[in-house]
Design a protein with these regions (language model features):
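Generic serine detector
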Residues: 11, 29, 54, 91, ...
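Glycine- and acidic/polar-rich repeat regions and solenoidal domains
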Residues: 36, 163, 167-177, 194-200, ...
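Extracellular polysaccharide-degrading/modifying enzymes targeting complex plant/algal/animal polysaccharides
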Residues: 5-177, 183, 418-419, 428-462
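N-terminal low-complexity, Pro/Thr/Ser-rich intrinsically disordered segments
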Residues: 1-3
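Detector for repetitive beta-architecture
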Residues: 22-24, 29, 42, 50, ...
Length: 462
């Protein structure tokens, strides 16, 4: 059948209802203000150039009251969302966002805190208040909770901008958690309160950008076989969620055979890429991960991963606290290969390639222990006298000597020969102490050290 053309104002939900599985819909240029869409199996949604699917409504009818402008009569707000927020960002529990000319304002909890770039919701009469003149400007309030959701199989969303949905934390504006085989191709997903995209089993997110979402760029759990490839994932966690809880660029959990490759993951307020809780058979390959607040790539309480041919630069912008954050962090995980990556530790920011063991109980494959890992053929550059590489333990320092983790053929560039850039078993070590160190008959540390003046080009040795 021919594609169904949808102009502005036509109901997308009605078109889904009135057409069979496998139908194709083309959303014409302009802003389609609709959401809560449950497609049928195999349906395809393609955006014409300039097509936007928005969860926001336009606010007109502002009334000036002294130094502020009030817009009464707003719909009942969503219940406050869940999730941990950082201190001072508690207003992020509210799901609605207000935008002026496409710029997100910060919500405050008291009218007295109003000022440029801020807005307040007065629950007494359901009014939004701002401290800047809205005359001649586009003011929008996000009201709809999700764009696409449901159990459809083999859905395709392509060339579409999806923005300004009032999603809670851990829910994507494109929420494919219950679906199978969703394909999200060359889409821009931005300015949503929770996650931009949540993937399910067999999903493919390819191309496009997932930017400036409130909690997380791309998330998912139970997303076996999902692929995230060639996506710009940037400046997420705009609402101020606690990144140690869950916030930042990409986080996938409890999934097998996930591939995260060739993405540019940068300037997120949290980790760049995070695999957590029984991630098995994960491939992190050829990503450029830079200037995220916490760890660059983190594989936590999981097994069987390959981290190769990535560029990781100046992650850990919040500073350093022991071995956290790091460019690459292997936390209570086993059988991980960290190979042929370019790693750069910025001045005052983060660490290099780090393994950590602490008591984390058992998972799908037994005790969660940091063992049987290989760190080989990486280039690690330190821009100052700080930052660590190696193996840190909490409570049981003997694990560093007893468990078979190996470091082979890595090259470390350091500012001078004096600083100590290694930790082993929770104890700082000088380079000379580590050469040829043995465990279970294998060489634990083997490589070379060069001065930073001979730093190579910023590319992985692949």
């Amino acid at each position: 059948m021919d594609a169904v053309i949808l102009d502005i104002g036509q109901s997308i939900a009605a078109a889904i209802r009135d057409n069979p599985p496998g139908a194709t819909f083309i959303l014409n240029s302009g802003v389609h203000r609709e959401g809560l869409l449950w497609p049928k199996d195999g349906q395809t949604f393609i955006g014409a150039p300039g097509a936007v699917l928005s969860g926001a409504r336009v606010l007109e009818g502002w009334q000036r009251e002294g130094a502020v402008w009030r817009r009464p009569g707003l719909p009942r707000p969503h219940p406050p969302g869940y999730g941990l927020l950082t201190a001072g960002r508690e207003s992020g529990r509210h799901l609605e966002e207000l935008f002026i000319d496409g710029v997100r304002l910060t919500r405050v909890d008291a009218q007295s805190d109003l000022g440029p770039g801020r807005w307040y919701f007065d629950a007494n009469d359901g009014a939004a208040l701002i401290a800047q003149d809205p005359t001649g400007r586009s003011v929008e309030l996000s009201v709809l909770g999700v764009a696409f959701s449901g159990p459809a199989r083999n859905l395709t969303i392509q060339d579409l901008t999806v923005e300004k949905f009032a999603t809670p934390a851990q829910i994507g504006a494109i929420h494919g958690h219950e679906g199978i085989g969703w394909r999200i191709l060359d889409c821009i997903v931005r300015w949503n309160h929770g996650q931009g995209i949540n993937v399910g089993p067999g999903a493919l997110v390819s191309g496009g950008a997932v930017i400036e979402n409130g909690q997380l760029g791309i998330g998912g759990g139970g997303a076996n076989g999902a692929r995230i490839e060639g996506v710009d994932v940037a400046r997420n966690n705009a609402a101020g969620y606690d990144p140690y809880w869950e916030a930042g660029g990409i986080k996938i959990s409890a999934s097998a055979a996930v591939i995260i490759a060739r993405n540019h993951v940068h300037h997120n307020a949290g980790p760049g890429i995070w695999g957590d809780i029984d991630m098995i058979g994960t491939l992190y390959e050829a990503n450029r991960v830079e200037e995220n607040d916490l760890n660059g790539i983190m594989h936590e309480i999981s097994q069987d991963a390959v981290i190769r041919c990535n560029v990781l630069v100046r992650n850990g912008r919040v500073g350093r606290d022991w071995l956290l954050p790091s460019q690459v962090l292997i936390q209570n995980s086993r059988n991980v290969q960290v190979e042929r990556n370019y790693v750069e530790v910025g001045a005052g920011s983060g660490n290099g390639i780090v393994l950590i063991q602490e008591e984390r109980g058992s998972g799908a494959r037994g005790p969660r222990e940091t063992r049987d890992n290989l760190v080989r053929g990486n280039i690690v550059v330190h821009r100052d006298a700080g930052g660590w590489n190696g193996f840190g333990t909490v409570a049981d320092a003997s694990a560093a000597d007893l468990w078979p983790n190996r470091w082979e053929a890595n090259i470390y560039y350091v500012p001078d020969e004096g600083p100590v850039h290694w930790m082993f078993g929770g104890v700082p070590r000088h380079w000379d102490e580590l050469q040829g160190r043995k465990a279970f008959g294998g060489t634990v540390v083997q490589g070379e050290r060069r001065l930073v003046g001979t730093t190579p080009a910023v590319k992985p040795p692949c």
